């Protein structure tokens, strides 16, 4: 049932040409398999990713983008290609600026470099 609803959401994302934001718990392998089967044109973004670098690598190889929040794995944050990275405050009471600062430090970026990269990445949502 959940997979059927997910596939319906994928169809909507494709029809309306919108990225798909995905909260995935204990189903990364199946999600990766579905992406291969469906071969979507629109970006798929894993929201609130807390996984290990190996999982991040699997997702990136399969074509996903990854969004990090307050509770991120530092090694994973370093391993995600800059053009596949998003940052969020969904799960946090911290200001987004604090989350940016923590992720920039983990990646060895300045806050300005990270903010500019995320702004470029946001273009998958349309013009900004």
How does the language model describe each region?
Residues 24, 48, 64, 70-72, ...:
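Active-site metal-binding loops of divalent metal-dependent hydrolases
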Residues 41-43, 83-84, 112-113:
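Short acidic capping loops at alpha-helix termini that bridge into adjacent secondary structure
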Residues 31-33, 56, 77, 95-101:
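Histidine/acidic-residue-rich catalytic or RNA/ligand-binding cores of hydrolases
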